[in-house]
Amino acid sequence: YLGAVLPGLLLSGLYMAYALIRCYITPALGPALPKEERLSFKEKLILLRSMIAPIILIILVLGLIFTGTATPVESAGVGSFGAMAVAALHRRLTFKAVSEACFVCLKNSALVLWIMFGASIFVAFYVLQGGGDFVAEMILGTGLPPYGILLLMMVILIFLGMFLDWVGILLLAVPIFVPIVMSLQFEGLFGLAGPQGAEIALWFGVIYLVNMQMSFISPPYGPALFYIRGTTPKEIPTSTIFASSVPFIFLQGVGLTMCIIFPELTLYLPRLAFGN
């Protein structure tokens, strides 16, 4: 979790910078609110007071994950219960609101689960046919240097992310890639120090997660794209959603490259918290 904090902030910063630059170049993409719709300072304070409970809930959920008290799934359950408690506190917890939220969640989850179901069948068939051994032998047989092998792995993961969900890729690629990566020596790029020993596993794990984040927005089977499809008006075609993801895929690639070149982005906070 600590290893992913700085890469996550980096990607968030890239996204925000892109949105600001695009809106600065083309103001129509993000027009300012009309003056009559803007909130006064007093109204902002009232709104801020109503945000205290949700902010506490966010801190609680992330705190449970950060301290290791609960798994992400368990924290999600706490967050769901807390969200209902916050809604009740604001007197908005009604049967209609809960049923609508459950229906939207069920519809979006079912869409993604069907994709995961098909991907899992493909992965199981591929592994049973010896595809994993074939890929490992192919990678080791290239004769590439360590960073060349890492680049090849990233390309393979990007390609797989276009057609499989992250769970399928986790079952398919990680058992093959991790032993290979752990056997390599990464001396660093451009005079920078590379990860050593057990740090390689942490570094590669975060790089894998950044790569998988790219798969979430990669057509044609990016789960995030289908989440958006399920929540946007029908007038917006799917092709528009796919095309809009391209700049963010590029930004993900930039973030991935920076995490590879600068291992400290991943390793600094874990070293600070737990020592070398």
Language model feature labels by segment:
Residues Y1-N276:
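Alpha-helical transmembrane segments of multi-pass membrane transport proteins
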